[in-house]
């Protein structure tokens, strides 16, 4: 009996360890990609790092040799200390953790593999898609039935994102396409304290940090996590969603260097440090209503992060199928977020072809009236599920 207790304790310690390492890797990837995606004073950013890393996890499952090593290093698993042999189990356990404790918020995750009808998957890979990713298999004809294949993929995308994203692909894919790996996530969170629609008024927002415009702005005095770091001229806010499992973190840099310089100095460690500074305060919040819709071809961005092997002729994806040589042509990502008085709805699809101590003080003010960064995160696992940058409204 003593041996059994020791064994159980050991298993818990190991599981908790690689669970934390997976989170660290994913959050580093989130911040790295936020810095790497192209932006401008007129262009906003919004994406789901969790969706992208999950879709790429299905590629990882079929990679071999140098291609596997490149993915292992490029997605930060090596740097976070997650052993290569633990990665797939960590994906499965991590997904389960994100579903624990959901109450008032909705967080749905779905995976699928659209497979050319004549492509024979290796049984081990098919088993991994099922057991690790719970992926649905869609048999399609990319050669002769291109439009029908696209329609089936887009129907899946629309259903799994609760109609927030109509389609992932607008036109036919290359007839050489043999496999499209898909991940879709949907989040709906209701603010812990809702804003009053009647209090929403036009207020000034500085597009690009310089050009004033009038936008619908929600206002209310509410308890949120808040901290002003005067030396950095940075305001940090954490707005909770009902149930306490999710929150939106806002970073509002007021310094003269602007949001781009601030963003490029940001690291996952600094972000977590900023969030750790917030204290529960009564704050008069002014937050613009906004809706962002984005679409990315991530091939170049992933290459800039060192993920290169899967895109070249040297790619070794022989763990997927023995039928010919497979390479990844692109990684496509679409995301939508809408923030209003009720809360937040966000969806994303990827295809691979702190509440601290309560302090009673006078009301503070948070006026989000210029470009800012925001993150939607799971407050228990600390995962960054969505990330964005609002420059222009």
Swiss-Prot record:
Q: What is this protein called?
A: Iripin-5
Q: Which GO terms describe its molecular function?
A: serine-type endopeptidase inhibitor activity; toxin activity
Which cysteines link up through disulfide bonds? Answer: none
Identify the glycosylated residues: 198, 245
On induction, the UniProt comment says: Induced by blood feeding.
Q: In which tissues is it expressed?
A: Highly expressed in female salivary gland during blood feeding. Expressed in female midgut and ovary during blood feeding.
**Where does the record locate the signal sequence feature?**
1-16
Keyword Glycoprotein listed? The answer is yes
User: Which Gene Ontology cellular component annotation is one that this UniProt entry carries?
Assistant: extracellular space
């Amino acid at each position: 009996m003593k041996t059994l207790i020791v064994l159980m304790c050991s298993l818990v310690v190991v599981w908790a360890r690689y669970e934390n390492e997976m989170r660290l890797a994913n959050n580093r990837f989130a911040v790295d990609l936020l810095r790497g995606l192209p932006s401008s004073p007129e262009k906003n950013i919004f994406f789901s790092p969790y969706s992208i890393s999950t879709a790429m996890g299905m590629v990882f499952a079929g990679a071999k040799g140098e291609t596997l090593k490149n993915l292992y290093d490029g997605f930060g698993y090596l740097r976070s200390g997650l052993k290569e042999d633990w990665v797939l189990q960590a994906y499965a356990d991590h997904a389960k953790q994100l579903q624990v404790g959901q109450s008032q918020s909705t967080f749905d995750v779905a995976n699928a593999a659209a497979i050319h009808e004549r492509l024979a998957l290796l049984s081990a890979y098919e088993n991994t898609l099922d057991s690790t990713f719970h992926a649905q298999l869609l048999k399609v004809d990319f050669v002769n039935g291109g439009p029908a294949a696209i329609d089936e993929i887009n129907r899946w995308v629309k259903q799994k994102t609760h109609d927030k994203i109509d389609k992932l692909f607008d036109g036919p894919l290359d007839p050489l396409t043999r496999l499209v790996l898909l991940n879709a996530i949907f989040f709906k969170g209701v603010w812990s304290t809702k804003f009053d629609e009647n209090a929403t008024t036009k207020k000034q927002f500085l597009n690009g940090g310089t050009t004033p415009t009038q936008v619908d702005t929600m206002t209310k005095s509410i308890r949120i996590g808040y901290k002003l770091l005067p030396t950095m001229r940075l305001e940090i806010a954490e707005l909770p969603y009902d149930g306490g499992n999710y929150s939106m973190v806002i970073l509002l840099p007021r310094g003269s260097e602007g949001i781009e310089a601030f963003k490029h100095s940001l690291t996952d460690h600094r972000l977590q440090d900023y969030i750790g500074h917030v204290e529960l305060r009564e704050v008069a919040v002014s937050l613009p209503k906004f809706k962002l819709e984005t679409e990315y071809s991530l091939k170049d961005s992933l290459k800039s992060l060192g993920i290169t092997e899967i895109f070249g002729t040297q790619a070794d994806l022989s763990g997927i199928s023995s039928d010919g040589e497979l390479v990844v042509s692109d990684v496509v990502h679409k995301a939508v977020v809408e923030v209003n008085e009720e809360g937040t709805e966000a969806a994303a699809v990827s295809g691979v072809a702190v509440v601290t101590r309560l302090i009673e003080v006078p009301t503070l003010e948070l006026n989000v009236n210029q470009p800012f960064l925001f993150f939607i995160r799971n407050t228990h696992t600390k995962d960054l599920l969505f990330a964005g940058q609002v420059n222009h409204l």
